Amino acid sequence: MPQTLFFVTSNASKLAEVSAILAASGISVQSMALDLPELQGSIEDISKDKAKRAAEAIGGPVLVEDTCLCFNALKGLPGPYIKWFMKDLGHEGLVNMLAAYEDKSAQAVCTFAHCEGPGKEPVLFQGRTDGKIVPPRGPAKFGWDPIFEYEGQTYAEMDKAAKNLISHRFKALEMLKEWMEAHP
């Protein structure tokens, strides 16, 4: 099933992770950087809207991704707005958001939307990983990886290959691969 997906991202770390996860399936990923306005709403609405806009912009099939980090004590915040919270507060600020709460549990959520082209309805693939928010540990190379702990290690402390077998992104991409095999 060798195929190429046009993945709308300007995040080199995200591109590398997606490419690594899909490589064994014979799916290659080409990055396309588009500056798309982001709808405010649920991660599903945001992902669908982004996929439709991207498909219109390039006139063909696209793959887009949106990631959430949901703190259970805050009823899902920062959720789909994690990029902006991360930019403004950093790792320590995110950890401090939970200082008054005993519950440090969180969920990493990744939603991919694949759209066949202009006017088509996107298909969603969502992966979730439960963990907890901890003070930063490990290299601060990729988003909030240093503060999201899964089974005793933060994503940042994990070997990339190990992370790519359990992450929210991996789970969503597994669903995408299954769908692509069923819809060649």
UniProtKB/Swiss-Prot annotation:
Its EC number is 3.6.1.66. Its cofactor is Mg(2+); Mn(2+). It is an enzyme of class 3 (hydrolase). GO terms for cellular component: cytoplasm; nucleus. It holds the Pfam family Ham1p_like. ITP binds at residues 9-14, 50, 66-67, 83, 142-145, 163, 168-169. SUPFAM superfamilies: ITPase-like. It catalyses: ITP + H2O = IMP + diphosphate + H(+); dITP + H2O = dIMP + diphosphate + H(+); XTP + H2O = XMP + diphosphate + H(+). One of its GO terms (molecular function) is dITP diphosphatase activity. Keywords: Cytoplasm, Hydrolase, Magnesium, Manganese, Metal-binding, Nucleotide metabolism, Nucleotide-binding, Nucleus. Binds 1 divalent metal cation per subunit; can use either Mg(2+) or Mn(2+). Mg(2+) binds at residue 38. Signal peptide: none annotated. Pyrophosphatase that hydrolyzes non-canonical purine nucleotides such as inosine triphosphate (ITP), deoxyinosine triphosphate (dITP) or xanthosine 5'-triphosphate (XTP) to their respective monophosphate derivatives. The enzyme does not distinguish between the deoxy- and ribose forms. Probably excludes non-canonical purines from RNA and DNA precursor pools, thus preventing their incorporation into RNA and DNA and avoiding chromosomal lesions. This is Inosine triphosphate pyrophosphatase. The lineage of its organism: Eukaryota, Fungi, Dikarya, Ascomycota, Pezizomycotina.
